[in-house]
Amino acid sequence: MELGSCFKTYEDFKECFSAYKRENRCSFILRDCVSVRFHNLNHGTSIREDILYVQVKFVCIRTQSNRKRTREADMCPAYLLLRYNERLDRLFISELNTQHIHGDSKVASPGGDTTGKSQKTMCLQRLQPVQPTTKKDLDTAEKSLVEPSFCLDKVQVSSKPEQEGITPSDLAKIAKVMKNFLKVDEGSMASFSVGDSQHLDRLSFQSSKMTDLFIRFPENLLLHRVENTQGHILYAFLVENKERESRVVHFAVLKAETVTSVAKMLSIFTEFNSDWPKVKVVFVDPSFHYRAILQEIFPAARILLSIYHTTRLLEKKLHRSSANPSFKRLMKEALREAVFVTSEASLKNLCQMSQAVLDEDLFNFLQAHWFTCELLWYMHVRKGLLACNTYMDSLDIVTSKVSSLFREQQSLLDCILCFVDYIDFFNTKGLKNLPTPPPKLKRARPASMPLKSKKAFGICGESLTSLPAEETKPDAQQVQVQQQSQVPPSQVGMLDTLHQSGSELAYKLCHNEWEVVQNSTHLVDMAGSSVDVQLLEDSHQVSKDGCSCSCSFQQWYHLPCRHILALLHTSQQPVGEAMVCRRWQKKYQYLLGPNGELQDRGMVPNTGQPEKQGRNDMIQDLSRELANLLMQTEGPELEERYSTLRKIVDIWAGPSQPSELFQQPGDFKDVGRLPFLWGKQEEGEGFPPATAVMHY
């Protein structure tokens, strides 16, 4: 494992990395990562999914001090940073520190002796970021997959460790560690049982932070199962937070998985967490065989198959199948579409394709409990596309941490000690720890350029471009000119009608939406009486005439939103006047000056009397406020406000004076021909100034 070593897929790296860890007798755990799905969604790229991570960091799980649990343990400085290089289309090791410092490690010496003193396993490499080796071809990169280079100072261990039981001394050590765990973390809980043969049968534990997490998010519970080479079983209990990120709330280790042990494990979980009756849904792996016991322990909860685990199962079955590469590629696309752009058609398509790679019993089981489970997919879809990506990525991170640590330990004792030492480490936000790269300038994809879309009905998309080195810091005007020049000629006049007939604010708001459309990949599909428009976000329904949309922007402002603009962009149509609410159109707006005053103040008689002048100002202010109120509504709400205003005017005018709502007095200018732009002409005698005061 050297700096600059390249790997075609993440599985290739994982194979070499596992061999490296076995050879050097060290354990690493995933710390930070940015998944390919997360990167593709946020940057509009199409990186291969077998890359899995565009950037991932692994750190040594061991500490520099003894195993006594402290709040801030000194971690071993060894780590590895793996990155994806787009030009090579390869993963490569960009940073590597192989200096291990383990305060309690027993490393075999070349002579075969062991020592309890602190040892350092060092490689003849310097820690420095590097770029992958580039040559005319990738022979060297491919060769590194077959013949990886390891450190010179190695410790030879058996690739298949012998099964080890828990001795009485080990039990005493575990009891001591758990006692210290409960003492240091106030509010933590632990329980273990010993069988007749004086072997550990079960261990359950959770920290105080885990308890708090379950109290806050008890509705959805997920069981993740891991089995190591010795046959021991680990169950991780996970919940979803409000961002739909997975968090571990409980661990349970079983020597053997039986009806009795699983029932006891679930019972201990309910004893530790008094809010267990609030659990509404429990998600399980398709291989979980104790659904009846789970239903008995959680009688009010629904037991559903986990979308995450079933998806990973289908991916594994597809990878191991003998299907041709083209079918595998199509099924991967179908699986991705079913999970992230869920629809009845996409699920039906995936179900049909899965029949070719699954045995009959498994296919029938998934067809009955996964493909056709309406509740499962309803819960999944209602949280939106972005939440689905966050959910899958966070589960990737957490399950990778749990599985790698549990499977890599040489003994169950070491595994338990490591899990207790780093119990709260599994809930770190690795997905968001890495810095976000600066955004690149984007441009709309020309209509003639083909689109690499995930959906067959994709119409248009985006491509990312970077400026030359000498133009990395253009001023705002240069950027604006460049972006405008990249708009296709057929779309230049798209907003002209809105710019000419609408207000400046309406044009600005709508133009912002148009910029989003230009810089996005949008999917347009017919959906009965409406058109589904999606910009890599929650889909919304747009009327066929383009006058309404279900998104919050259009509902609030009554302006063409990004979804309407995407529909117009697809059909090569401009924004029409009917798509803009009257309150944004110039001919309906009250003509006010820059400071809110009436444009033509000369038409208001200046009598020189402060009382009457003050009343004129009050009438103008009232007219302006009423105009604003009425311009903010349309349809039934406008009629209701208009009716209320007429009643107020009738009451104000008094029984002896009929309402003059539709009369146009000469003292005030009706610029919009609307019934609310009016003013009552003052007579010579006039009313006392006090009668002009209107309380509201």
From Swiss-Prot:
InterPro entries: Zinc_finger_SWIM, Znf_PMZ, Znf_SWIM, ZSWIM1-3_helical, ZSWIM1-3_RNaseH-like, ZSWIM1/3_C, ZSWIM3_N. It comes from the Eukaryota. Transmembrane segments: none annotated. Signal peptide: none annotated. Keywords: Metal-binding, Zinc, Zinc-finger. One of its GO terms (molecular function) is zinc ion binding. This is Zinc finger SWIM domain-containing protein 3. It comes from Homo sapiens (Human). The gene is ZSWIM3.
